[in-house]
Amino acid sequence: MGVARTGLNRGQGIERVASTRGFDETVVHFEQLIAAKGLMLFAKIDFTGDAKRAGLTMPRMMLLVFGNPKGGTPVMVAAPSSALDLPLKVLVSEEADGEVWLSFNSPEYLAQRHGIPSELVANIAGIRGLVGAAAAN
């Protein structure tokens, strides 16, 4: 795996960070980090498992939906359309070469997309640090 690398798909506001862990380890570590921060895991969607149950195959992908109503609610009150993208989400995916990535919408993209007031962007900006910590050794 190696040192965490980052990538940004600026056109769509998607940030990606390469994990130094395997897929399962990355998912578990991320779950532990959000719990330690007092955040709630609202949903864990196993796209690969769902595909398998439908008789299909796909690379490993899991979407983690998490947040805290104390942080998200003021954002949604100020910018109601932000509820389309909140709670926050992180996609953990594994590529054919075994490299594991964590992907998320950049806070700046979400702020621009929904007109989130600058004083509330901090409520969603912590995702970058969480993903960085989950990807690192």
Regions found by a protein language model. Name each.
Residues 23, 31-37, 42-88, 92:
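Compact, glycine-rich, soluble single-domain proteins
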Residues 112-137:
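Well-ordered alpha/beta subsegment
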Residues 27-31, 76, 124, 128-131:
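A generic alpha-helix structural signal
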Residues 2-38:
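Terminal, regulation- and interaction-focused segments at domain boundaries
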Residues 11-12, 59-61, 97:
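Sequence-level motif detector for i,i+2 pairs with an aromatic at +2
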Residues 89-117:
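Beta-strand/loop substructures that line and gate deep hydrophobic ligand-binding cavities in soluble
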